[in-house]
Amino acid sequence: MKISANFLLNNCARTYTKKKTLKKCKRELVEVVDGLVGVMMTSSNREKPDIESGYDGSSDEDSTENSRAEICPSALCFFDQIVASAQDKKVVLFLDYDGTLSPIVNDPEKAFMSSEMRATVKSVAKHFPTAIVSGRSRDKVFDFVKLTEIYYAGSHGMDILASFADSDSTIEKTKETKLFQPANEFLTMITEVSKSLIEVTKAIKGATVENNKFCVSVHYRNVDKKNWKLVAQVVNNVLKDFPSLKVSTGRKVLEVRPMINWDKGKAVEFLLRSLELDDSETVLPIYIGDDKTDEDAFKVLRERKNGCGILVSQVPKKSEAFFMLRGPSEVVILPVMLNFFAALLIMPS
């Protein structure tokens, strides 16, 4: 275990000079770290089944023979490295939604985030610019998250809404909204292909089609395994009439998207530029995600040579990310730790 109260105490000790304040910080830090260690030990077990939401607790990811540490070390155990990288830098936090902020569930309409996770994201956004980058439509993600303090990029980054707030918290914040939709010309086509996919999958029990505005998701999580190939066949048959669209795979989902040079990595770069936070020397972007599409963002951060990609996965796998977390139960811990550390750094001495 590399997370230690002493590490955090030494860092905050450099910031505070008042004996009373430092003593209080030490006490709070010990309590927080002790609590986090307990949560980490609990979260090391497999997720418990959630009957109401339809989550069965099992992983649908491919396992490998390698241990987790041989592929990506735990972001919690190596939190000191993350904080060391963030010293004297502006942290920007990017988060996937499904499988990261919420559990993967059988019914996509029931992928609710916990109240604890929502409160954590809301709190961390007070200290760091925070964005959610999801394959879902932007409106649908907002309906799940319900936070106005953060930025949203839906449709795998093809629908970005950035609201820039005044930094003076003592006055009412005024916002300048920037909407970016690089696949806008495909909107009518996506609507058409969505209708076609709904029609051809009607006969396949368990298959569902989700129109995410600039992309379409065909979910086969509830389809009998013997019919998975059939799902792929009907999707490919429909796409024969739409040569400018492509299909990619996710976690028991087929994603139909425009064939343009845009992905979650491009969305991250766009948001960093829009926020005027694209200086790799002074900014540390952190991206947390669980899906194959998040690898594009991990790759961008790796190529910047000053970013931190964190893969969410219950099983070890090769990734462009630097660290791993094992599910939403661990994801919720990292922002808490970042948030607490940031709060200490900005307290007056």
From Swiss-Prot:
This protein's name: Probable trehalose-phosphate phosphatase 5
Species this protein is from: Oryza sativa subsp. japonica
Recorded catalytic activity of this chain's protein: alpha,alpha-trehalose 6-phosphate + H2O = alpha,alpha-trehalose + phosphate
Pfam families the record matches: Trehalose_PPase (PF02358)
Pathway(s) served: Glycan biosynthesis; trehalose biosynthesis
Gene3D superfamilies documented for this protein: HAD superfamily/HAD-like, Trehalose-6-phosphate phosphatase related protein, domain 2
Function: Removes the phosphate from trehalose 6-phosphate to produce free trehalose. Trehalose accumulation in plant may improve abiotic stress tolerance.
Keyword Signal on entry: no
